Every structure is written in structure tokens, then in C-alpha cells.
Amino acid sequence: MLEKLAKKTYLGLGSNLGNKKKNIEIAKFLLQQNSKFRILKTSSFYKTKSYPNYKDPFFLNIVIEGETSLKPLDLFVFVKEIELKLGRKKTFKNAPRECDIDILDYDQ
């Protein structure tokens, strides 16, 4: 259950490998499994080119507005665990990935 002092946060979710939309939907589902994180709003899906490797597959992305009672470092660890569950491997910088979750903003 979220504590009364929950902080607003914005997460960017993206995928450029496999079934991109399904990867993002699974990541959203896994985020909601943590009782200390709640999704408030979700953007529409949008595409972006891979950077800096424009020849890599495009990214499908969303932005999530959420509330969390997790501290910033705990939130970071939590989203990295989700990336790993979805098959993300650190092969080289800016490599294509099944799931990428970035903390865009954390209300302190």
C-alpha cells in the first residue's frame, strides 16, 4: 500500500527488440505488481529512432506518470530488475534492447 507521502514520478519505457508493444505492456504490468508503485496516467505509444545508431530498429515508447513511496535508488533498482526480467542484456553501450526504463523525474 502506498504511504501518504508518496512521490510523483515519471518513467520512460521503451523497446526496440522483439514484440515491442508486448514488452512495454509486460513492463507496465510488472510495475503495478509492486504495492509501493501506482500508475496514474500513461501516454499514447510513440516511435523514435535509435540513437546514436540510426540503423538499429526504431523504439516504441510510452511515458508513465506514477506515484511511489520508493526512494529514488530503490525505484532505480526496481526498474532495472524489470528490464532484466524482460531479457535486457548489457552487451554494449546503446545496444538494442527488449526493455528500457528511465526515471525521467522524481518529485523530491
Label each PLM-derived region with a short phrase.
Residues 1-108:
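Core catalytic alpha/beta fold that binds nucleotide/phospho-ligands
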